């Protein structure tokens, strides 16, 4: 008897649950139908051609606006970087008073330069007209290849040129001791902030006299006249002006790097 009552109770609960679910489903369906009629009253069909075309049109417009924004932003960024080329000439001279260069032997040939040897260095830097001392060079060369048929070497170089209060320029690339080479200008500070371009390295006397011509882009302003005097014709006999070598006030730039 108890078993029969339990069965009837379970059956009653099950029927009640099913009826509630059915009513909820019908109520939900009625809500959807009402929502659909509201769309129809507004003259909008969720699955009709007008709604689809409007949706596609809106999406297309949004995509076009997005593309236009990034296109114009990219052009603005590119065009905002100055592309005017400015030339700057400097002499790098090793006058034998800076204990430079040093040679760190990491290669496998103890009696000659070979792959892997490191050469840190620092030399004096003068304006192209040799009238003023501007600073120093400082950096590191890694020997990549000894070239006996040309009586020289190939280095991978990374170094900077310091110009006192004006800032500095950094370069990177190959340095060949037996011919002219170009290195990339990788950046700068001070008046050289944003600099890019390349620099031509001309070997005059290895490793004590070098002449550089920078072709600089990206500078916000013209280079100061103090740095851009007419360069002395490069030769193995060039020498800085006496007042520049003696670092007299008239022969140096402001707070020149020493």
From Swiss-Prot:
Provide the catalytic activity annotation: (9Z,13S,15Z)-12,13-epoxyoctadeca-9,11,15-trienoate = (9S,13S,15Z)-12-oxophyto-10,15-dienoate
Coiled-coil spans in chain: none
Induction comment: Low local and systemic induction by wounding.
Extract one GO BP annotation from the record.
Answer: response to fungus
Keywords on this record? Answer: Chloroplast, Isomerase, Plastid, Transit peptide
Q: A single GO molecular function, which one?
A: allene-oxide cyclase activity
Tissue spec: Highly expressed in fully developed leaves.
Under InterPro entries, the record lists:
Allene_ox_cyc (IPR009410), Allene_oxi_cyc_Dirigent (IPR044859), Allene_oxi_cyc_sf (IPR034871)
Pfam families cross-referenced by the UniProt entry: Allene_ox_cyc (PF06351)
Family, according to the entry, reads as follows: Belongs to the allene oxide cyclase family.
User: What name appears for this protein in its UniProt entry?
Assistant: Allene oxide cyclase 3, chloroplastic
UniProt source species: Arabidopsis thaliana (Mouse-ear cress)
Give the taxonomic lineage as stored in the record. Answer: Eukaryota, Viridiplantae, Streptophyta, Embryophyta, Tracheophyta
């Amino acid at each position: 008897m108890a078993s029969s009552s339990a069965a009837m109770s379970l059956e009653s609960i099950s029927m009640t649950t099913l009826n509630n679910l059915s009513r909820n489903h019908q109520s939900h369906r009625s809500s959807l139908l009402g929502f659909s009629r509201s769309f129809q009253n507004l003259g909008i069909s969720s699955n009709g051609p007008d709604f689809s075309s409007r949706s596609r049109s809106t999406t297309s417009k949004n995509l076009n606006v997005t593309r236009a924004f990034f296109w114009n932003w990219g052009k603005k960024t590119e065009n905002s970087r100055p592309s005017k080329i400015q030339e700057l000439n400097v002499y790098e001279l090793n006058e034998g008073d800076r204990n430079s260069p040093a040679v760190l032997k990491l290669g496998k040939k103890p009696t000659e330069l070979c792959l892997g040897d490191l050469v840190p260095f620092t030399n004096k830097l003068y304006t192209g007209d040799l009238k003023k001392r501007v600073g120093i060079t400082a950096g590191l060369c890694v020997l990549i290849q000894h070239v006996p048929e040309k009586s020289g070497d190939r280095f991978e170089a990374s170094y900077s040129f310091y110009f006192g209060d004006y800032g500095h320029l950094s370069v990177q690339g190959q340095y060949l001791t037996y011919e002219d080479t170009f290195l990339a200008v990788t950046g700068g500070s001070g008046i050289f902030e944003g600099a890019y371009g390349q620099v031509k390295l001309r070997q005059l006397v290895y490793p004590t006299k070098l002449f550089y011509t920078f072709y600089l882009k990206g500078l916000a302003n013209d280079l100061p006249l103090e740095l851009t005097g007419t360069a002395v014709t490069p030769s193995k006999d060039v020498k800085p002006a006496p007042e520049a070598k003696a670092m007299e006030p008239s022969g140096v730039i402001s707070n020149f790097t020493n």
